[in-house]
Amino acid sequence: MDPQNYSLVSEFVLHGLCTSRHLQNFFFIFFFGVYVAIMLGNLLILVTVISDPCLHSSPMYFLLGNLAFLDMWLASFATPKMIRDFLSDQKLISFGGCMAQIFFLHFTGGAEMVLLVSMAYDRYVAICKPLHYMTLMSWQTCIRLVLASWVVGFVHSISQVAFTVNLPYCGPNEVDSFFCDLPLVIKLACMDTYVLGIIMISDSGLLSLSCFLLLLISYTVILLAIRQRAAGSTSKALSTCSAHIMVVTLFFGPCIFVYVRPFSRFSVDKLLSVFYTIFTPLLNPIIYTLRNEEMKAAMKKLQNRRVTFQ
């Protein structure tokens, strides 16, 4: 299409989760409560890890604190706007705001994928090589793992936004989701996006699939090692691994389903995106603290310290 014959789109229309006014009122209350719970739960983990010397000196809890920080960002890139849009008849987002959503989703999402692999490696060393744990999971190693997750997330998001922001958007501007989902946005471009879809598969799909396979291998090795131990000594390790596997499944399953097939869309995709953008950040604090006696003891200590100061 000749650039002289069209005007560029300056904003996009988001369809949201539903069109029913009654459901939107319910979703406003529900997701507002969920978002508050996400922020408070992850903030509590972050503050507990930072304030407790035993926790913030442990590689496992250092990584967990970083996961809580990323979850707060992952839940905040689109959820506040979605909540506000439940009360609005027109769900508009500017072009710049749309690109920002794509950037922060892939930045935090990519970083969290790599961080979850690092946490699986930490559990592998703790369970399979306990005598070498402090050597293999030194502070230098932990910092490198966290920095690697942030660098991968940043490079991944830049690579996604770089080709998306320069596409010509001149026709339809309606996105059938509650945020600017990359596969839906590039389909609005006034050009053939088949090659871009292939690029997206080799980027988002490859990142999520490779991290997921690494996690599967790690936890398979861990579970096999646990089975070889005496029954009485495996309960804590098995509980920890089960919690991690649950997080991995809830986070990676929807991501892989959505991003490895950008040329086809299903109505369930919109609901699946709720899992990795909202429910995973909500469940992480619960899963990682529910059976973790050290974390619960540190939280009680933090609460007692607060009562003492009052």
From Swiss-Prot:
InterPro entries: GPCR_Rhodpsn (IPR000276), GPCR_Rhodpsn_7TM (IPR017452), Olfact_rcpt (IPR000725), Olfactory_Receptors (IPR050427). Residues 50-58, 122-140, 221-236, 291-310 are cytoplasmic. Keywords: Cell membrane, Disulfide bond, G-protein coupled receptor, Glycoprotein, Membrane, Olfaction, Receptor, Sensory transduction, Transducer, Transmembrane, Transmembrane helix. Disulfide bonds join 98-190. Residues 1-25, 81-101, 160-196, 260-270 are extracellular. GO terms for cellular component: plasma membrane. The keyword Ligase does not apply. It is a multi-pass membrane protein. Glycans are attached at residue 5. The chain crosses the membrane at residues 26-49, 59-80, 102-121, 141-159, 197-220, 237-259, 271-290. It is found in: Cell membrane. Pfam families: 7tm_4. Its main location: membrane. GO terms for molecular function: G protein-coupled receptor activity; olfactory receptor activity. It comes from the Eukaryota. Belongs to the G-protein coupled receptor 1 family. Odorant receptor. This is Olfactory receptor 4K14. The gene is OR4K14.
